[in-house]
């Protein structure tokens, strides 16, 4: 796996699924392929994206700045600086300075990532902030190691939170999660339908599922009534894909 592929993998792991994630993936691919060369436009686009947390925007802004060539005097962006200040905690800043000194001695991506993983997310963000504000310089490879360590820590905490929700025994949360997943699956079916001959059928199934979820939410139903809803939808989707000659086992 190439270095840039690895960076793209880690960065995308902290972005919530949805159309925006697909859009960001495309921007990252373009940036890494040298196709998107206007850093100002790219940063303005990033600043106005909805849903993303300030820290996620900070990480993406840092990656774009590292990768896209820019004029030396180009102004640093406030939204990135604010996201990478370690919540203004002096303790984070102290640790960031110590980490920076260690990173200066590293020359490889993996070495930098290994060193960075022993620090907290706040300290890692502060260290990125130091480098972003030109208070310190490291090689691009080492900076990418720092980025990936930060993403790994964020993804770990997101995974723990997700696992807690999936494992919850609260029937109301499980019920709502099944309905949200059914709606998301229906939306994916509509997007995949495109203009094929079978599109009408897929759209019909998706539309019925959306209406069912809407009705269940409006009138209120027993928490067990949504069981199997997403699975039924996925079966319909896979049957549709087979007829289309498409195999997408990974969809689940």
Swiss-Prot record:
Membrane-binding as annotated region, ranges: 1-164
Keyword terms of this UniProt record: Host nucleus, Membrane, RNA-binding, Viral matrix protein, Virion
Chief location bin: virion
SUPFAM superfamilies linked to this entry: Influenza virus matrix protein M1
Bilayer topology term: Peripheral membrane protein
Residue ranges of the region described as RNP-binding: 165-252
Keyword Ribosomal protein found: no
GO cellular component: host cell nucleus; membrane; virion membrane
Domain of life: Viruses
Compartments it resides in: Virion membrane; Host nucleus
Comment field (misc): Most abundant protein in virion. When expressed alone can form virus-like particles in transfected cells.
Assembly behavior: Homodimer and homomultimer. Interacts with NEP. Binds ribonucleocapsid by both interacting with genomic RNA and NP protein. May interact with HA and NA. Cannot bind NP without genomic RNA.
Family membership noted in the UniProt record: Belongs to the influenza viruses Matrix protein M1 family.
Protein name: Matrix protein 1
């Amino acid at each position: 796996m190439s270095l840039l592929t690895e960076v793209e993998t880690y960065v995308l792991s902290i972005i919530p699924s949805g159309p925006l994630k697909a859009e960001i993936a495309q921007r990252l691919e373009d940036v890494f392929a040298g196709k998107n060369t206007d850093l100002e436009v790219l940063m303005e686009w990033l600043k106005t994206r909805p849903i993303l947390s300030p820290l996620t925007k900070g990480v993406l802004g840092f990656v774009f700045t590292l990768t896209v060539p820019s004029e030396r005097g180009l102004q640093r962006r406030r939204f990135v600086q604010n996201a990478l200040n370690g919540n203004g905690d002096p303790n984070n800043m102290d640790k960031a300075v110590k980490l920076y000194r260690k990173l200066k001695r590293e020359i490889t991506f993996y070495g930098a990532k290994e060193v960075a993983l022993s620090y907290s997310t706040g300290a890692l963000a502060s260290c990125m902030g130091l480098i972003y504000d030109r208070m310190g310089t490291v090689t691009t490879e080492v900076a990418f190691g720092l980025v990936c360590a930060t993403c790994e820590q964020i993804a770990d905490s997101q995974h723990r939170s997700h696992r807690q929700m999936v494992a919850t025994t609260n029937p109301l949360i499980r019920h709502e999660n099944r309905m949200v997943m059914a709606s998301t699956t229906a939306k994916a079916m509509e997007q995949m339908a495109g203009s094929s001959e079978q599109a009408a059928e897929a759209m019909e199934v998706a539309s019925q599922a959306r209406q069912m979820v809407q009705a269940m939410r409006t009138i209120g139903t027993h928490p067990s009534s949504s069981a199997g809803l997403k699975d039924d939808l996925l079966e319909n989707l896979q049957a549709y894909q087979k007829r289309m000659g498409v195999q997408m086992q990974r969809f689940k």
